[in-house]
Regions:
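Short alpha-helical segments enriched in small residues
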Residues: 1-147
Length: 147
């Protein structure tokens, strides 16, 4: 389906990058790999209307994935990646390399659009690096609001 063809597959890579660090078990709780739109809906609570109107690869879906993961995992921080890593699946409107990353920290959710170039592996790797950077920024900004 649409989600399977278009999913960037960055979620598993992101979880792997995090748990490769010693001591990660003290901060990393769970991960969701939701290639199919049905999984995005069932596991993360992404609305059917969001997927129909904006598609799996969109700011709106990235935000709903992040806030849904936050709620499902009862976590303090959640991050989502949805995009088109290629080599196919891209369109003129949504080309290969288009990635949306969402971050939710204690109920405050943002999403950002990225456009990466290169092969599938490079796009996925860049998406994971961008997700870690965005998550760090999201945590720091959220913490500074509390002071």
């Amino acid at each position: 389906g649409d989600g399977l063809r278009r999913a960037c597959g960055g979620e598993g890579l992101l979880a792997g990058r995090i748990v490769n660090v010693a001591g990660a078990s003290s901060v990393f709780q769970t991960g969701y790999v939701t290639y199919a739109n049905q999984a995005k809906r069932r596991l993360l609570g992404v609305k059917k209307s969001t997927l129909r109107e904006f598609g799996a690869v969109s700011t709106q879906t990235a935000k709903e994935m992040a806030s849904g993961a936050l709620a499902a995992a009862k976590a303090d921080v959640a991050v989502s990646i949805t995009g088109i890593a290629g080599p196919d699946g891209g369109t003129a409107q949504k080309p290969v390399g288009l990635v949306y990353i969402g971050c939710s920290v204690q109920g405050h959710t943002i999403a950002q659009e990225y456009r990466f170039s290169g092969n599938r592996e490079k796009i996925r790797d860049n998406a994971v690096s961008a997700a870690l950077t965005l998550t760090r920024r999201c945590i720091l900004e959220n913490c500074s609001k509390k002071e």
